[in-house]
């Protein structure tokens, strides 16, 4: 062997290894599933490369996975003829570069998660140390020489050029030196059961090196004629039998070895759905996704006609840890062409919002040598995609029939559905049927648009909703006062993505979606008398509206008498086409935003005042007596700033607001302001205040 180079494990990988080695796990058997799954991935890669360049298979034309238990040396080897690894791959992939999932997996483990989740985090190789004290990886890639990686997980590993070892041709051989209490994994029966349990549906042949004992009878003469063989495979039976002719016969046991194919199942998607058991679907799902739990729902179908393909789609029980990690290639639907695996992160096959759906698609119509580039232009793929989306929505509707299952599904994937409303204009209406919201009338349950429509008041033309940070924040919002009083139901949209979704949805079942926080809210059930009364009130408050607008300047676009609030003195509404307060909050939180757009979209605020509120009535009287009264200006600023808060906006200058409150407290407590002039020295003058803040600060 050439000289060995020693490398230190990256810190996180080292921590992971010590967790795996020093913690007791009951289901250590998953190591085999993980290593076979890695072998299958390596075979996928070389098969895909060979579609465009046949010579890639020259080193080893056969594609296989082999398991070799060796009882005398207490080793189990997993051999594949996959793509293999170069020296750089060995160093990087097995030790010096931590994958994004390493840290997350450790956190999950420490939080009590099951070790069998390891494959989902991309660190399945290290599960070998659940059963092995030492691991040796021999590998040969077409572009490099054969190398050996070795480690006892003691903080470092060695990599050596393999000059003496048996040439692999191409591929990887992982040899596990089993711990003394893990020797069950050398038993043929145990290995067969494990492959059947976890890896039955791997699409490459998995062979086990098995031992066969046969009995053979030979006569004494034959025995003497043959030279004595040093054959450990022959065992002489003590039992001798005399034949009629007086010659003796001997029984000899012969031990031979052969490769036995263990996974004989044909691909599950080629079978009829009615022939497949729940358990088979569950086993296939687990081998496909590395999930340790069963799936929530499955859809198995075939499309026939001009285009033919078969598919199985699964919905997991929970969202993966990196569901919205845009840097990660989506490994959701595996694409096969005539049973040959082509690729598994094919973005053209399913839209991004359905990236949580797992499954396989097998088409007979696509060309075998299809590449990522030609996929984009492929018409067949567009038809497949359309069908997959349709079937996914059907599957979600089937889940919705069971309330408990749908609650689980909605908790995990509601954001995806809302993203679908935003992205998929063709299926917007169908996806809208799947949405659920809390409302002013739904209590602890969530309601659908469909159910909302059945409960609408007579003469109600619109669906009312309010957006905000949380259910608690919107429940007592001043915007809901009149709507609640008149018995209208209002949907609470409290997920950040709701803002984007409702911006695209606009209507449901011919009924417009109307925000309770934007101007233009019209309630149709007003009597003539109420209208008359409101007009009179508007007139009497006209001057106050002008005074408030003068004091606030550019902070608000206009000041009007409200017909949406009942108890609160005032509120701030946004323009019908501008951002809501909640949207403004969301946009402020985005680092990479267009600030010119922010200034334009967020500055259209209208102050609505409540003519029936005592504070407003008193303010009207004071303003009419003397509109330059200092207390009027102070009250208007204070009302504006509290309205910002109750309407869901944020304060640009919280210190000024606090100082204003303190001044009011002093007035209430009859403390003479002049005594504390110094203390209040920093308090800005109100007139300046208005001028200073008149330019609405951009949401920057």
Curated annotation (Swiss-Prot):
Looking up SUPFAM superfamilies in the UniProt record yields: ATPase domain of HSP90 chaperone/DNA topoisomerase II/histidine kinase (SSF55874), HSP90 C-terminal domain (SSF110942), Ribosomal protein S5 domain 2-like (SSF54211)
* Alphabetically ordered keywords of this record: ATP-binding, Chaperone, Cytoplasm, Immunity, Innate immunity, Nucleotide-binding, Phosphoprotein, Plant defense, Stress response
Give the main localization category.
cytoplasm
Q: What induces it?
A: By heat shock and infection by avirulent and virulent bacterial pathogens (P.syringae).
Cellular component per GO, a single term: cytoplasm
Q: What does this gene product do? A: Functions as a holding molecular chaperone (holdase) which stabilizes unfolding protein intermediates and rapidly releases them in an active form once stress has abated. Functions as a folding molecular chaperone (foldase) that assists the non-covalent folding of proteins in an ATP-dependent manner. Molecular chaperone involved in R gene-mediated disease resistance. Required for full RPS2-mediated resistance through interaction with RAR1. Possesses probably ATPase activity.
Print the domain comment field: The TPR repeat-binding motif mediates interaction with TPR repeat-containing proteins.
Alphabetized PANTHER family for the sequence: HEAT SHOCK PROTEIN 90 FAMILY MEMBER
The identity of this protein, by name, is Heat shock protein 90-1
Give the species this sequence originates from.
Answer: Arabidopsis thaliana (Mouse-ear cress)
What is the phylogenetic placement of the source species in the record?
A: Eukaryota, Viridiplantae, Streptophyta, Embryophyta, Tracheophyta
What is the name of the gene encoding this protein? HSP90-1
